[in-house]
């Protein structure tokens, strides 16, 4: 009995000693499971944006998810992920990986998602993905792939989505996807593919979405896709497709959306192009080179509920009438920006409005509506009643003569009314723009506006001041006095060399004074014997002429005085010159 008690006590002591050791071992293994600089959430390890050049070796063996995104990994070595046999998803995108060993993914058979996008991979060996047969999602987009091996995806029977977007692929091998029987999404967009073989999609019986946009296809034959019996969405936008044909009589009942926008489609090869897709619901034909669509093509669009036709070069003639009538009866979604590209007079006008306003569909094929000029309205003379005895047979109608109906007048009034509204709106907007400019300049530069106002006020004040000065000053008056001396004064002047001369005052701003000269100069001088003195000066009166001797010793003194209304004039004595001669 005592021995048993001692043995129990010793066993409990051993357990107490072993328990801390086990705990320390578990803690150390947990610490070893999360590498330095990484973030661990349960069994998920995130080593992102760490500039890693090698994959950490201290990752726990029970890791279910590993993210090594945004690092500097350059290659994947042999058995790179050995020991991580529980791994279900692996993210290696946005690295510098250019070389992958054929056996790099050995030991991770449970992997379901592998992301290798945005690297520098230029090729894969055929057996690269053989160890990961349980893959559901494989992303190889945004790399530098030039070609694919014929057995590149062999064995990937559970693959659901395959992304090969934005590479440099030119061709796709025949039957390369034959083992991908469960594939639902295939993205081959943004490559350089020019053509596809007829059996390239063999075995893809569950594919629902196919991306072939931004490639270099020039022709499209719907007979390439008879094996895609489950395809619902086909994207072929922004290629160089000019012709769409159908060389096989079959019904593609699964297709619901077809995107052909951004191509160079001018016409369809025949009315049976869309007859093989009776359940088509969405059709994109915008940004092509279509000028019209025939009635047979329109009749095959029996299930459409969404269509886009903008960005084409629609010719607004009678050929457009079938499309306009179809659009009017279409009850689904459509764009309203279907614009005429020709003729020149209708460029920029909505197709439906052009047909409605210009009666394009109401005219014969030989008659053209002249839109460059407005035709004058015809005037009709009232018919005078004929006498009953003058009954003449009716003249046959002239060929081509038509009487304008009431629709023409209504259309003209409608057009003129629109022009009036457009002109009024333009005038109103221009006035608003002017007012806005004035307001902004007043707010932005208040000092300059004040200076302009002050300058305008100064100009007004100066103008008013000039007008007041003109009213205050008297009008300029000039008098010409014809001075004729008497006989006694003439004889005295001849003998003595002197003679009296009278200066009269008058209201003017200028004055004239007589010139001093001798007798011979006086008799021979034919110009007025006057000169001009300073302005506003009053002259001395009764100043005589002097001889040459007296001129040397004598100076003419004039007493001046400022006066605004002074002018003195001297007469001319040309009559005496004539008498003496």
From Swiss-Prot:
How the protein sits in the membrane? Single-pass type I membrane protein
- Pinpoint the LRRCT domain residues: 312-363
Extract one GO BP annotation from the record: regulation of presynapse assembly
Q: What is this protein called?
A: Leucine-rich repeat transmembrane neuronal protein 3
Its main localization is membrane
What does the UniProt entry say about where the protein is found? Cell membrane; Postsynaptic cell membrane
Q: Which Pfam families match?
A: LRR_1, LRR_8
Q: Identify the residue ranges that face the Extracellular compartment according to the record.
A: 31-419
Native source species: Homo sapiens (Human)
Signal peptide limits: 1-30
The LRR repeats lie at: 63-83, 86-107, 110-131, 134-155, 158-179, 182-203, 206-226, 230-251, 254-275, 279-300
Q: Which residues lie on this side of the membrane: Cytoplasmic?
A: 441-581
Question: Disulfide bonds, which pairs?
Answer: none
């Amino acid at each position: 009995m005592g021995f048993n008690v001692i043995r129990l006590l010793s066993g409990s002591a051993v357990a107490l000693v072993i328990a801390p050791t086990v705990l320390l071992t578990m803690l150390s293994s947990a610490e070893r499971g999360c590498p330095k600089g990484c973030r661990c959430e349960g069994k998920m390890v995130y080593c992102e944006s760490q500039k890693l050049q090698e994959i950490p070796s201290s990752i726990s063996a029970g890791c279910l998810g590993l993210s090594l995104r945004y690092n500097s990994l350059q290659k994947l070595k042999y058995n790179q992920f050995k020991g991580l046999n529980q791994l279900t998803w692996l993210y290696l995108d946005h690295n510098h990986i250019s070389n992958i060993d054929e056996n790099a993914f050995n030991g991770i058979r449970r992997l379901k998602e592998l992301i290798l996008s945005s690297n520098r991979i230029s090729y894969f060996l055929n057996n690269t993905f053989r160890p990961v047969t349980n893959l559901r999602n494989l992303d190889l987009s945004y790399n530098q792939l030039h070609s694919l091996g014929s057995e590149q995806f062999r064995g990937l029977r559970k693959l659901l989505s395959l992304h090969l977007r934005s590479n440099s692929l030119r061709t796709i091998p025949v039957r390369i996807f034959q083992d991908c029987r469960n594939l639902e999404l295939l993205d081959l967009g943004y490559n350089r593919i020019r053509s596809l073989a007829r059996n390239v999609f063999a075995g893809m019986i569950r594919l629902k979405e196919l991306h072939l946009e931004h490639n270099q296809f020039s022709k499209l034959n719907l007979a390439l896709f008879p094996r895609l019996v489950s395809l619902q969405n086909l994207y072929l936008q922004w290629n160089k497709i000019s012709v769409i044909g159908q060389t096989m009589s079959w019904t593609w009942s699964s297709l619901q959306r077809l995107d052909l926008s951004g191509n160079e489609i001018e016409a369809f090869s025949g009315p049976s192009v869309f007859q093989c897709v009776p359940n088509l619901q969405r059709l994109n034909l915008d940004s092509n080179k279509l000028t019209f669509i025939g009635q047979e093509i329109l009749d095959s669009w029996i299930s459409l509920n969404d269509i886009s036709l903008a960005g084409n070069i629609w010719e607004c003639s009678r050929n457009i009438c079938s499309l306009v009538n179809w659009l009017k009866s279409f009850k689904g979604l459509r764009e309203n920006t279907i614009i005429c590209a020709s003729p020149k007079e209708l460029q920029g006008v909505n197709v439906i409005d052009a047909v409605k306003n210009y009666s394009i569909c109401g005219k014969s094929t030989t008659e053209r509506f002249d839109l460059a000029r407005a035709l004058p309205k015809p005037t009709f003379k009232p018919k005078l009643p004929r006498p009953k005895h003058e009954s003449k047979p009716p003249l046959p109608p002239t060929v081509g003569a038509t009487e304008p109906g009431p629709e023409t007048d209504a259309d003209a009034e409608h057009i003129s009314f629109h022009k009036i509204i457009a002109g009024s709106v333009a005038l109103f907007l221009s006035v608003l723009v002017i007012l806005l400019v004035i307001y902004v300049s007043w707010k932005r530069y208040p000092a300059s506006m004040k200076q302009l106002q002050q300058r305008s006020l100064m100009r007004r004040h100066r103008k008013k001041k000039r007008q007041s000065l003109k009213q205050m000053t008297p009008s300029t008056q000039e008098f010409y006095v014809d001075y004729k001396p008497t006989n006694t004064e003439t004889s005295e002047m001849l003998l003595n060399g002197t003679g009296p001369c009278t200066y009269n005052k008058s209201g003017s701003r200028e004055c004239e004074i007589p010139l001093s000269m001798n007798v011979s100069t006086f008799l021979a001088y034919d110009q007025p014997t006057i000169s001009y003195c300073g302005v506003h000066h009053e002259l001395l009166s009764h100043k005589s002429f002097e001889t040459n001797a007296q001129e040397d010793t004598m100076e003419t003194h004039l007493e001046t005085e400022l006066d605004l209304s002074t002018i003195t004039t001297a007469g001319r004595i040309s009559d005496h010159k004539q008498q003496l001669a």
